Structure formats: structure tokens, C-alpha cells
Amino acid sequence: MKKMLWTAACALAMQGLVAAEHLEDKTAKAAEKVSDKPEIFLLGDSIRMGYCQDVKNELKDVADVRWPKENCANSQNTLIHLSWWKGIVSKPAVIQFNCGHWDVSRWDGDDEPITSLEEYGRNIRLIIRRLRRDYPGATVVFATTTTMNPNGTCGKNKRTTEDIRRYNAKAVEVARAEKVPVNDLFAFVEKWPSSDYADYAHFSKEANKRLGRHVAEFLKGQLKK
């Protein structure tokens, strides 16, 4: 029996090593720079996915704007996958990241958010420090999480604007302590009517263009510093 248990333990250990090596293999090398324009790197959830092309269009003459094709999801997922996304940029001048909608969500009817408030603050701090380590000289910007549709819909994974407000406050506290500029997207969209939303949290095409213009102007200002 002891021999069988030992064999099983060894097998599990080997699986762990293989999994770790698999993760290490995903670490990408920096991309080659293909433009003389400064690079801007956008990281974030589906809200970022909604406006990133508009940011690129707005800044086409002044910056090379890049982003991961996938949804960066919650703060822990973002932290874990930062090394995977190194191959997207070479030496970004500005990096804006956001995460929060997933973090505050009570997934599939859970009683608590996916990420506790304290865990969220810790993850934001670690993301900031990792980005600074991986991209020396880049200006790191934190973008706050946007509001829920004021009509009260919340989708399957419940979250509220009040939840978002609390988590934003924690993230901003961390960002300011780390001397990171904050792009307050929450404040920018807070008074938008329900007609600017496509569903419970995501924006219409026209609203995304407006949000993209705002993000572009903010990041353009960071390039000049």
C-alpha cells in the first residue's frame, strides 16, 4: 500500500512539474518594433475590447496601439498572463490596464465576489510592479472600472455599480501609493443614460467611440510627459 501511495505521489509531482514547464513555455519574447511611433499597450476586459480599435484609430498618426486579442478578465488572470502577452509589444511608452468587472462579479449566483476587496488591491499592486519590471521606462496607467447600466440589469453574474465604486476606491488608493496616473473611466461614463449601453455593462458602438476618444486623449497626454 505504501508503495502504491508513493507511486501516486510521484505521478502527481511529475504532473505538477510538467504543468509548470508548460506555463513557462508560454512566456513570450518581446515583439520586434515595426514603427517609429511610440507604442501604447492596452490591457483589460471586455470594456477595453469595446474601445481599443477606436483608440487605435484616434492615435494612428502618433502611436502604435496594441492589445491582447483575448479578454484579460479579472485581476488574477491578468497577473498570471502578463508574461504571455510580452510578445505583443517591444518597448511600450505607455501601458494602460483595467480589471474589475470580473473581480466584483458574484459568479453564477455566488454569495461573494470572485475577488475579495483586499485581494483586488493586492493584485492591482502586483500588476503595477510587474509591468514596471517588465517594461522599464514605460508609464503605467490604471483605468477605473466603468458603471453598470443604470436601468438595473446585471446579467447572470451579478454585480452593482456600488460594488464597482468600492473596488475602484481600493484600486485608486493602491495606484496613488504606487504613483500611477489614474484614468477615471467610471467618472467619465457615470452619468451616461441607459441608451448608451448595449446590455447590462457593455456600451453601444457610438458610446464606445466616445469612450475611445477619451482614452486616446488621456494616453496622448501621457506620451507628452
Predicted features and spans:
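Alpha-helical cap/lid subdomain in secreted, periplasmic
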Residues: 2, 58-61, 79-225
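Bacterial N-terminal signal peptides
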Residues: 7-16
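Residues that line or immediately flank small-molecule/substrate-binding pockets and catalytic motifs
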Residues: 8, 44, 99
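General helical structural elements
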Residues: 6-7, 52
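Compositionally biased, low-complexity repeat tracts
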Residues: 12, 35-36, 151
